Regions:
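Active-site helix of classical SDR
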Residues: 135-142
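Conserved Rossmann-fold NAD(P)-dependent oxidoreductase catalytic core, especially the SDR/UDP-sugar
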Residues: 91-135
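NAD(P)H-binding glycine-rich loop region in Rossmannoid oxidoreductase-like domains
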Residues: 47-85
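SDR active-site strand-loop-helix element
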Residues: 8, 32, 65-69, 107-113, ...
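Rossmann-fold cofactor-recognition segment
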Residues: 36-49
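NAD(P)-dependent short-chain dehydrogenase/reductase
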Residues: 121-122, 145-199, 203-212, 237-241
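N-terminal Rossmann NAD(P)H-binding glycine-rich loop of SDR-like oxidoreductase domains
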Residues: 5-25
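C-terminal substrate-binding subdomain of Rossmann-fold SDR/epimerase-dehydratase oxidoreductases
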Residues: 184-298
Length: 298
């Protein structure tokens, strides 16, 4: 048995896929975060409750940690919740881990490519300056900075995932929303900014990368997790139209247009691939087909 893997946010979208990868490696997975029990392996706690969190982490004594618990939606309306969850919650977790009798072998913190903001470079690598454009990105940038306080006590690696999607993601995110509209064969969809480009990965690729970073990731390093290819919203609409056999009318709703929208996010995964080996590449069309079929039963 490889030992115990602690996954915060296990009950969330990404947590399920990460747990599957870790279990395949022989880890016993234990989850921490808000939400109900999952097969008896999920312990409910608000990471902002430092005392209770510390007690649970001391009981678990994890060998490896994947920290996913966070407010993950850029347009989340409660600013105080964004900062308290993403910064204070992370700080409490790191303090609890540092106090453990047995030092964790690796701690992976999931940040976000949104920290790069509107960088004026065609492809973003880890050397690019961070210039966050919204509260969510600022909170993730701050999380990265505060993690440096524990660099002598904990072997921390930071991932900066670009956009990713898959079966089970909330309809508040763009691609699940679009898939849902096409699967229900709705005639039109309301969107915000459509003149944007995003680097999309499959959640299964991201989960695989996270699991491998626990073994190969170098402490103190930051790694982009991305496909290296960006798509426009129009590209995605065309893929879904082909899958569903019809085109949908797009209406731009000003209420959905975000201030300080990042126009283009395209990442370089060279550092990641050099560290963990060849990535588990899944074409975006295949991901959309997987999501579409999961909803339609086809």
């Amino acid at each position: 048995m490889a030992g115990t893997a602690l996954v915060t946010g296990l009950a969330g979208f990404t947590g399920h896929y990460v747990a599957r990868e870790l279990e395949a490696l022989g880890y016993e997975v234990v989850g921490l975060g808000q939400g109900g029990a999952l097969d008896g392996r999920h312990l409910s706690v608000d990471l902002r409750d430092a005392r209770r969190l510390g007690e649970l982490v001391a009981e678990i004594q994890p060998q490896v940690v994947v920290h996913l618990a966070a407010v993950a939606f850029v347009a989340h309306g409660d600013v105080s919740d964004i900062y308290s969850s993403n910064i204070v919650g992370t700080r409490n977790l790191l303090a609890a881990l540092a106090a453990c009798k047995r030092r964790a072998e690796k701690v992976l913190l999931a940040s976000s490519a949104n920290v790069y903001g509107n960088a004026e470079v065609p492809v973003l690598d880890e050397s690019c300056a961070v210039q966050p454009e919204n509260d969510y990105a600022v909170s993730k940038c701050a999380m990265e900075l505060l993690s440096r306080h524990w660099r002598d006590d904990l072997p921390i690696v930071v991932s900066r995932p670009f956009n990713y999607t898959g079966v089970g993601q909330s309809l508040s995110f763009l691609l699940p929303k679009l898939v849902d509209h096409f699967a229900r064969r709705l005639p039109q969809v309301e969107l915000g900014n459509i003149d944007v480009y995003r680097d999309f990965s499959d959640v299964r690729t991201v989960a695989d990368a996270y699991a491998r970073l626990l073994g190969a990731g170098e402490s103190g390093e930051v790694y982009n997790v991305c496909s290296g290819v960006s798509y426009s919203i129009q590209d995605i609409l065309l893929m879904l139209a082909e899958l569903a056999g019809y085109s949908i009318d797009v209406h731009v709703n000003p209420a959905f247009v975000r201030a300080n929208e990042v126009k283009r996010l395209a990442g370089s995964n060279r550092k990641l691939a050099a560290t963990i080996g060849e990535l588990k590449h899944i074409p975006l069309r295949d991901t959309l087909q997987w999501m579409y079929r999961a909803q339609t039963g086809q």
